[in-house]
Structure formats: structure tokens, C-alpha cells
Amino acid sequence: MTEEVILKVGLTPKHQCSYLGHEQEQLLVLMDHSLLNASGYERLLTAGFRRSGNDIYRPHCPACNACQSLRIHSERFVPSRSQKRIRQLNQDIELVLSYDDKPEYYQLYERYIRERHHDGSMYPPSRTQYKGFLHCDWMPPLYLEMRKDNRLIGVATTDLLPHSLSAMYTFFDPAHADRSLGTFAILSQLELARRTGRSWLYLGYLVEECRKMNYKRQYLPHERLIQGEWKNIDSKPE
């Protein structure tokens, strides 16, 4: 943030971390409703906060700082050879933008969770769960549809902000897993940011020790929020 802002926040009770099972998780939750708008949220993103449903939070764990906010500059990003291949592979995909949450989205989400994440905390899927973390009353998310021959095979949910995008969640038809639609969704959001003159795509938190969260480091160069400062990372760790 470019100016000092005093935030009213709450602190959640400690509980086992869903990313690192040996750690205790605790979150700061924003209580100041004056910042619940697109520009306010964008400022909070630069300070390491994140949206889930209507709530904005940031990790505040007692003995761990593994979560690092990560963002990619839309003009500086250089796709790797494999990312170029994935983009080429999906040239036959039609991308459609929508602010309407269509019934077919949840049907696809439910199938995705049941087949891809049946061993995780999001199983079993439900409409309440789906709406609880994707929907937002004060800022409707943008849905990036991926269609093959007019059939919905993937959806990336993202927040469209004044100067950036914030990727929320991507789900897809497990029958098309060989297309690497998760990677394609991020590449498509980067292209959307670039075409609309938005500088950044925020990807949420990177957790190096967690396989489900460390895939984000493959998008280079990127920036990570480390000890309150955004640091440029232009190479993969050894």
C-alpha cells in the first residue's frame, strides 16, 4: 500500500493447517466494511490479503510464515516451453466471459471435486460450499468459460479489479485432464489482464512445501510478498 491505513481485523482460533499438517493455522479477517469494493480489495491484495466468499483474510500463523502472496506482471511474464505447448494444444478452446453463474457451472464443479479431490477437504461438494467461497455480494466474480464445440469443459473464476485480476478457482471436466486446463486458465487470465491494460494477476498464496500450492512458482518472472515487501523472482528454485 502507498499510504498507511489502520485496519479493523479479527483473529480466528488456531486449527490444523490444511496445507502443512504439522503447523497451526490462524487468520486475520477484515472487519472494516468500508474496503469491501473492487478498489479497496485491490489495495488489500498488495498487503497480502485474499478473498473467500464475502470475507477478506490473511494468514497470521503463530509459528509459520510459509504462505507467500504471489503475483505475475502481465507484460513481463515469459511463458516456458511447456506453457507454450499447452497454449497451442488448447487453440481449439473458445473462451467466453460471463458475470452470470450458470447452472452448468455447478454441475461441472461437482463432477470435478468428486473425481479430482475426493480425498480433500472440499469433498463432498455442495451448492452451499460452492457459493460460500466463490460468490461475493459486494463484487461479483467474472467467469472465464472454456468451451469445446460449444460444450463447457472448464471454468476459471477471477476477480476483475481496476489494475489487476485475482484468480480465485478453476475447475474442469476430468475427461479433459490431458489438456492441462488449470495451466491454460492461468495463461488465459494473464492474456486477459494484458489485453485490458491490467498490470497484475494475483494467484493467491504459494506454499513451497505443499504440492497443491507450489505449482504457482512455474510462472516466471513473478513477485512474492516476503516480510512485507514484494520481491522479484525470475528463476525456479534449485
From Swiss-Prot:
Entries under Pfam families matching the protein: ATE_C, ATE_N
Protein name, UniProt field: Aspartate/glutamate leucyltransferase
Function statement: Functions in the N-end rule pathway of protein degradation where it conjugates Leu from its aminoacyl-tRNA to the N-termini of proteins containing an N-terminal aspartate or glutamate.
Cell location: Cytoplasm
Catalysed reaction equations from the record: N-terminal L-glutamyl-[protein] + L-leucyl-tRNA(Leu) = N-terminal L-leucyl-L-glutamyl-[protein] + tRNA(Leu) + H(+); N-terminal L-aspartyl-[protein] + L-leucyl-tRNA(Leu) = N-terminal L-leucyl-L-aspartyl-[protein] + tRNA(Leu) + H(+)
Keywords recorded for this protein, A-Z: Acyltransferase, Cytoplasm, Transferase
EC number(s) recorded for this UniProt protein: 2.3.2.29
Entry annotated with the keyword Cytoplasm: yes
Organism annotation: Aeromonas hydrophila subsp. hydrophila (strain ATCC 7966 / DSM 30187 / BCRC 13018 / CCUG 14551 / JCM 1027 / KCTC 2358 / NCIMB 9240 / NCTC 8049)
GO biological process: ubiquitin-dependent protein catabolic process via the N-end rule pathway
InterPro entries according to UniProt: Acyl_CoA_acyltransferase, Asp_Glu_LeuTrfase, N-end_Aminoacyl_Trfase, N-end_Aminoacyl_Trfase_C, N-end_Aminoacyl_Trfase_N
Gene Ontology cellular component list: cytoplasm
Main location: cytoplasm
GO molecular function: arginyl-tRNA--protein transferase activity; leucyl-tRNA--protein transferase activity
Annotated SUPFAM superfamilies: Acyl-CoA N-acyltransferases (Nat)
Family, similarity comment: Belongs to the R-transferase family. Bpt subfamily.
Keyword Acyltransferase on entry: yes
Primary enzyme class: transferase
Name of the gene this protein is made from: bpt
